[in-house]
Amino acid sequence: MAATLGRWIHVVAAWLFVLAIIVQAYLAGQGLPQLGGTSGFEAHIAFGYSIVLVVLVILIGALVGRAPRSQVGLSVALIVLYFVQTSLPYAKASSPAIAALHPANAMLLLILAIYVAVRARRLVSGVAPAA
């Protein structure tokens, strides 16, 4: 019973994280004056920090749901990439080239999040995720 609930929490959180990354891209676009944005990046920054809870729930759901080790590992990788993502802008003053990796890391984060979400959905449907 707990494992089934954990797997459902895992899949829902994974898809919410995918949606959150897409919302983040939109909020970043709203902050760019070149695209007509006037609000700055405050919403992008605040929302970016708030989704840490979702990425942590992905891992918790995988653990409670007794997901395969590979799925747990991918969930940990999401957390690592998330913390890299939130750290990259702080390199702006000392290393702008490193800070410029922020959008590229966001793409990696989105790809991995989709992969984790698809595999999570297969877990709840009873189909073994591909290795």
Where are these regions (language model features)?
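Polytopic transmembrane helical bundles with strong interfacial aromatic enrichment
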Residues: 1-131
